[in-house]
């Protein structure tokens, strides 16, 4: 019986995503973000049905096991744009390095100005890095990885919902620039949003996601020390 329940929860997740996708396609607005809608739909079902979250997560084992493959799938549009990206590697690398540095510095300084402890500054610092790397960076700096995970999700949601809209309003028209910008600050969630909007933006967001994770993990200790250098 338990085996059947596992598959039922898996199908429930797929149904929630399908329903969110239909709503997103129907209104065609970045506000109706597929990820956010899926979370809201599933949360409502769990609350109304009084389904324990632990049971739901255990029942999603088949989908959870596919998370690694979904990350690998992000490499497909990157491969399709590989030649163009190779010609612009200097611009891409410099943009990603600057974006990584400023994303960590701004978050850390804001936390410091708000009176946060060094532990909380270390927790907030890697908010714009993809989840696994961000949690490890936070732990290494003396932060709280679990709280960092929340910050990563919030940063991802903000970028995936508003990133594309804000850049368009600012007059940024090049999909390459949009992809690099969104991927640098909103990691996987922002990249998925770019994928849904424009393949080129999705490709550049993918490479920004990967490079920012690597570069930020190297720069994080130096940025953390820099924040407290003048304090």
UniProtKB/Swiss-Prot annotation:
Listed Pfam families: LrgB
Subcellular localization(s) per the UniProt record: Cell membrane
InterPro entries: CidB/LrgB, YohK-like
Gene Ontology CC, one term: plasma membrane
Topology relative to the membrane: Multi-pass membrane protein
UniProt keyword Transmembrane helix present: yes
Keywords from the named record: Cell membrane, Membrane, Transmembrane, Transmembrane helix
Keyword Transmembrane part of the UniProt annotation: yes
Transmembrane segments: 4-24, 29-49, 58-78, 95-115, 147-167, 211-231
Annotated family: Belongs to the YohK (E.coli)/YwbG (IPA-22R) (B.subtilis) family.
Protein name per the record: Uncharacterized protein HI_1298
Taxonomic lineage of the native organism: Bacteria, Pseudomonadati, Pseudomonadota, Gammaproteobacteria, Pasteurellales
């Amino acid at each position: 019986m338990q085996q059947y329940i596992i598959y039922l929860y898996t199908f429930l997740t797929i149904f929630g995503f399908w329903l969110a996708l239909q709503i997103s396609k129907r209104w065609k607005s970045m506000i109706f973000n597929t990820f956010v809608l899926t979370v809201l739909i599933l949360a409502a079902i769990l609350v109304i049905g009084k389904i324990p979250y632990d049971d739901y997560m255990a029942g999603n084992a088949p989908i959870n096991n596919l998370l690694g493959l979904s990350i690998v799938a992000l490499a497909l549009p990157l491969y399709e744009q590989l030649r163009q990206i190779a010609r612009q590697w200097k611009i891409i690398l410099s943009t990603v390095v600057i974006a990584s540095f400023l994303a960590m510095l701004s978050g850390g300084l804001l936390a410091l100005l708000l009176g946060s402890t060094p532990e909380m500054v270390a927790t907030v610092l890697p908010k714009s890095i993809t989840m696994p790397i961000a949690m490890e960076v936070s732990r290494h700096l003396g932060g709280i990885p679990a709280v960092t995970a929340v910050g990563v999700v919030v940063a991802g949601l903000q970028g995936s919902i508003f990133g594309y809209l804000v850049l368009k309003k600012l007059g940024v028209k090049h999909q390459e620039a949009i992809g690099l910008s969104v991927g640098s600050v909103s990691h996987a969630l922002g990249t998925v949003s770019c994928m849904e909007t424009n393949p080129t933006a999705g490709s550049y967001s993918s490479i920004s996601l990967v490079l920012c994770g690597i570069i930020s993990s190297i720069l994080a200790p130096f940025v953390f020390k820099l924040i407290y250098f003048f304090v």
